[in-house]
Amino acid sequence: MVLGKRHIFVLSLFCLFGTGCSFRSNQLDALKTIFWEDSGPEPQWVLSWEGLTERVFAVNAGPSIFFANSDGILVHFNGVFVEKIEGVRLNSRAEMDISITKTEMDASEVFSYRGATSALGDMLCDPPEESISNLALKVGSVQVIKITQKCIIEDRVVEQSITLNQTRQLMGLQFFAHPARQPVTIRYSQI
């Protein structure tokens, strides 16, 4: 008789919750709401470096901006230059952790790169120059402020840049994290 009571209980529940049931039911919507998990915020920035492309979050901390993701990437932009990059894997074996310092020498700036165990080299740069230009978008364009800096690595002339919108909010960075490699780009994903 216990089995019969269970059947009656299940039928009662079905009648209670199943009444007026249709393809779109209030009961089903309520259950979805209870068990639905919010996936949370989505990263709005893209980091690119030598074939690696990662979506990252931008976290403002006073004058600094930290770019990070759940895979362990952390880039510290102090508002003037990137001074630290951690957790980037250009290949599956080694994680790169690089510290960057800037010193002024005469009318130039020297960026020094250091890995976890050794110095990686230096880059000599002219003072930054600011200009206004148009940035092409998928639809139309937007006027931006571009701060560029010409640099010399061994015998190569290279460029670093900071792109700001007209209210001087960051839109993109192009910088060197290692003097022997290509530049890193971090940009707002909507551009």
Regions found by a protein language model. Give the residues of each.
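Acidic, serine/threonine-rich low-complexity disordered tracts
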Residues: 22-75, 100-191
